[in-house]
Amino acid sequence: MAALEVLFILFVSIASSLASEGVSWLLVYRTENYKRGKANIDRLQIQLDKLVDQESETSSLSKKGNKDKKIEKIEEQLKIANKELSFSKMKSMFAVAISMIALFSYLNRIFDGVVVCKLPFVPIGFLQGISHRTIAGDDYTDCSMTFIYAICSMFIRNNIQLILGTAPPKTKQANPWALPEEKKTR
């Protein structure tokens, strides 16, 4: 019985990820606004990479000053374009979030207090609350639906986005903690 429950949770996770990506495609990815924004980000990123490569090859101080200004201008445009693209995705994310919360609530009622599987390890402290949620007892190798659903949904949704080509653009601006190239070399 436990194997069927795990397979059911996996199936629901895959189906919900596909459905959420379908909703995202309908509301966002097929629109001209999104396609223009993504093309603009790609174009700006190529320009920025080209300028950074040229700057590293340039030795003249006056040329570097001009290039620095151009780089700053393009980085600012890239930041604005990323912001606009994120804003256009907002309605889709809202619809997906509501549907995922409803689905999770439904699954939580079905599997309330049910041990779905046994883990071959004891999860570290902060994961025990997720892996042992709604399960009575102190055996932390017992696993609830919440843990399996959360892990599968995160993994499956990211992979579906990669397969469908709807993953967020990978820009240097995406990591707010990344150091600029100048500061890394010092």
UniProtKB/Swiss-Prot annotation:
SMART domains: DUF106
Pfam families reported for this sequence: EMC3_TMCO1
Localization per Swiss-Prot or TrEMBL: Endoplasmic reticulum membrane
Topological domains, Cytoplasmic: 31-88, 165-186
Record membrane topology: Multi-pass membrane protein
Record's GO cellular component terms: cytoplasm; endoplasmic reticulum; endoplasmic reticulum membrane
UniProt xrefs under InterPro entries: EMC3/TMCO1, TMCO1
GO MF assignments: calcium channel activity
Gene Ontology biological-process annotations: endoplasmic reticulum calcium ion homeostasis
TM region positions: 3-30, 89-108, 143-164
Residue spans, topological domain Lumenal: 1-2, 109-122, 133-142
Keywords per UniProt: Calcium, Calcium channel, Calcium transport, Coiled coil, Endoplasmic reticulum, Ion channel, Ion transport, Membrane, Transmembrane, Transmembrane helix, Transport
Non-traversing membrane segments, not crossing the membrane: 123-132
Paired cysteines (S-S): none
Keyword RNA-binding included in the entry's annotation: no
Coiled coil: 31-91
Reported function: Calcium-selective channel required to prevent calcium stores from overfilling. Component of the multi-pass translocon (MPT) complex that mediates insertion of multi-pass membrane proteins into the lipid bilayer of membranes.
Record-linked PANTHER family: CALCIUM LOAD-ACTIVATED CALCIUM CHANNEL (PTHR20917:SF0), PNAS-RELATED (PTHR20917)
Family, as annotated: Belongs to the TMCO1 family.
Subunit structure: Homodimer and homotetramer. Component of the multi-pass translocon (MPT) complex.
Name of the molecule in the record: Calcium load-activated calcium channel homolog
Organism annotation: Dictyostelium discoideum
Gene, per the UniProt record: tmco1
